[in-house]
Amino acid sequence: MKENNKEQERFVAYITKQQCVNEAASVTDFLRKYAFRYHNSAFISSDPVQFPHRYHRKEDIEISGFLTAYLSFGARPQILKAAGRLDAVMQHNPLVYVLSKDWKSDFCGEESFYRTVSKNKMGELFHWLHGIYTKYGCMEAALMACQEGSPIQRLCRLW
């Protein structure tokens, strides 16, 4: 029994050593594989990630990406439809829309905007984004303002 445990320990040590040696190459290969698979126009055009990809300004990408991710539950065609509607409401200019406060009249009421997300909830998100973009200028700066905790924890503290 003890001999079997020693064999297992040697095997685990060997595998761990091999993983460390190959880690850099395997991570690179992993990232390249998925970049090739997902970072191409064929995939992007049929995925909700297409919305932030439409923009060039960092703030527009952040806002579009955040809101699209927030709505990304359910069937992909329905997500695309909701994200498309949201993009149209923002007149394809997320930062200007957030700063304009037009969302106060566009997103009020308890009726659903998408599935279980009410217009009021969308209004809360826009209110939160407005605070970030008026105080920090971009979400990245807001997250970097406090270095404590993970990015998700910092994002939650901003809420």
Label each residue range with its predicted role.
Residues 1-159:
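HhH-family (HhH-GPD) DNA N-glycosylase catalytic core used in base-excision repair
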